[in-house]
Regions:
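Aromatic/basic-lined ligand-recognition segments
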Residues: 65, 158-171
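Charge-rich, low-complexity terminal tails
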Residues: 168-224
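Extended cationic-aromatic binding surfaces that line active-site or macromolecule-binding grooves
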Residues: 34-89
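Contiguous, amphipathic alpha-helical segments that mediate oligomerization or scaffolding
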Residues: 4, 14-49, 201-220
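Aromatic- and glycine-enriched beta-alpha-beta binding-site module
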Residues: 70-130
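Compact, glycine/acidic-enriched structural inserts
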Residues: 105-164
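A generic structural signal for short, non-catalytic loop/turn and secondary-structure boundary residues
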Residues: 55-58, 77-79, 94, 150, ...
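Short His/Asp/Glu-rich catalytic/ion-coordination signatures at enzyme active sites or charged loops
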Residues: 1-30, 181-195
């Protein structure tokens, strides 16, 4: 199924226009339905170790394939990936740390954490990470975690944020504007019969990382 998704997206990348998409709409609808089924299976299996996402519906986690081109110089109408975000306080629009799957030709990945937090949440996350830095680093330094998710991703400030010492040992962590880690995968990873078993194990490694971040997010959202 995932091989068919990648093939469809490869063709879409070469024919990113409404005429081609409409001619292949039934094919897209069938693949999207299959992807929804896969994401629901992931949710149900992740919920066995992260019960906070139990009851989440896959359809609420999938991102639209249609691009917002209103303010973009790139006027191609469609995204060239299938993706879903599974988090405890909702689906794709959630501010909570969660689990992300992304299928794209030569750009597949699994990811987790908090991406693009609003300023107030970013400030709160930095504060809690700074005050509990040893615990945070210990999570990321565990061998299995570090092997799967080598570094944090996203934009990094050139200088330390205001209010923090410039000689802080883990300055790069605090300079991040996102607290997200990524495991890049070859397309073939998702073609294997046991890909979901492996993905669930990779997501399981994220649980302590997400749990740490969600302590802050829950306070920010007034969920505690």
């Amino acid at each position: 199924m995932n091989a068919e998704i990648i093939q469809f997206l490869t063709e879409l990348r070469q024919n990113n226009n409404r005429e081609w998409f409409q001619a292949n709409k039934s094919r897209y609808d069938s693949l999207r339905k299959g992807f929804i089924d896969e994401v629901q299976q992931l949710i149900d299996r992740i919920a066995l170790f992260d019960p906070e996402i139990a009851g989440l519906e896959a359809k609420d986690c999938l991102f639209r394939i249609y691009r917002d081109i209103r303010f973009s110089p790139d006027k191609t109408p469609y995204k060239i990936h299938f993706a879903a975000y599974m988090a405890s306080c909702g689906g794709r629009g959630s501010e909570c740390a969660g689990y992300y799957i992304h299928l794209e030709p030569d750009g597949c990945l699994l990811s987790g954490g908090v991406w693009c937090p609003p300023p107030a949440l970013l400030k709160a996350l930095r504060k809690d990470i700074y005050e509990n830095i040893e615990d945070f680093v210990a999570i990321m330094e565990k061998p299995a975690f570090k092997k799967t998710y080598p570094t944090m991703e996203g934009e990094v400030l050139k200088r330390m944020p205001t209010g923090y010492p410039s000689d802080f040992k883990y300055d790069e962590i605090l300079r991040h504007k996102d607290f997200s880690v990524v495991s890049y995968k070859p397309d073939e990873f998702f073609f294997e019969p046991d890909w979901m078993d492996k993905a669930v194990e990779d997501f399981k490694l994220l649980y302590p990382f997400n749990q740490f971040l969600n302590y802050t997010v829950d306070e920010y959202l007034g969920r505690v």
